[in-house]
């Protein structure tokens, strides 16, 4: 029997397989429920480190919105509730900024976005306080919107520098809020990043 012992010519430029050769298997943990999310954000009141998935952050934001609405509408019937609502809003600023920082970390972004937003928020509050200080409590005691508008117009005209700083800070803050809002809608980055392990993909 004749055997074919001829050598086969080498084949060059063979197509190489595309894509990663190893795909790690990851699974998403169940979405955090509202109660657990709120408890987690309060437990991490001053925690600006680590990561937070979307369900943790947005359930907490919904909790803040509902609580603020209750106090705002309740203040129409019982005026003291408005002051309680303002106090609660101030107390919730820190955990809200902390949760937002962890949410940005979860998408692989820096928390400096939140730091700049917080600074602009403080600038707006201080500027507003300087503008309305000459009117004392008159601006808040009157229920006439026309009178309030006239007071604010006089305040802006009497101190144009502070008014300009407040307006510029408010506009820049609004732009940053839109940007960070989009960031917080993004899904978690699977695997560990420089801020810690993924809270969603294990």
Stretches found by the model and what they are:
Residues 2-3, 9-67, 92-113, 181-202:
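Membrane-interface extramembranous regions at the lipid-water interface
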Residues 5-6, 14, 145, 155, ...:
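Short linear motifs in intrinsically disordered/low-complexity regions
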Residues 15-21, 76-78, 154-157:
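Short amphipathic alpha-helical segments, especially helix-boundary/capping motifs
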Residues 36-37, 82-83, 154:
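Generic signal for short, ordered secondary-structure residues
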Residues 55-97, 110-136, 162-185:
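Hydrophobic alpha-helical transmembrane segments in multi-pass membrane proteins
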Residues 132-150:
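Juxtamembrane non-transmembrane "cap" segments at the membrane-aqueous interface
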Residues 150-166:
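Membrane-interface segments at the starts/ends of alpha-helical transmembrane spans
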């Amino acid at each position: 029997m004749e055997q074919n012992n001829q050598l086969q010519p080498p084949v060059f430029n063979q197509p190489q397989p595309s894509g990663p050769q190893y795909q790690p298997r990851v699974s998403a943990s169940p979405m955090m429920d509202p109660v657990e999310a709120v408890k987690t954000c309060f437990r991490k009141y001053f925690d600006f480190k680590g990561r937070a998935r979307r369900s943790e952050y947005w359930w907490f934001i919904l909790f803040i919105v509902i609580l603020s609405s209750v106090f705002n509408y309740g203040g129409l019937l019982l005026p003291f509730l408005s002051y309680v609502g303002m106090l609660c809003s101030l107390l919730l600023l820190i955990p809200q900024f902390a949760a937002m920082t962890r949410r940005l970390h979860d998408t692989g972004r820096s928390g400096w976005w939140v730091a700049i937003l917080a600074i602009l928020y403080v600038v707006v509050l201080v500027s507003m306080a300087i503008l309305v200080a000459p009117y004392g409590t008159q601006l808040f005691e009157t229920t006439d919107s026309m009178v309030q508008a006239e007071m604010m117009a006089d305040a802006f005209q009497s101190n144009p520098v502070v008014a300009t700083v407040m307006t510029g800070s408010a506009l820049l803050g609004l732009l940053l809020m839109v940007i960070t809002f989009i960031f917080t809608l993004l899904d978690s980055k699977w695997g560990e990043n420089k801020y810690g392990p993924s809270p969603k993909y294990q």
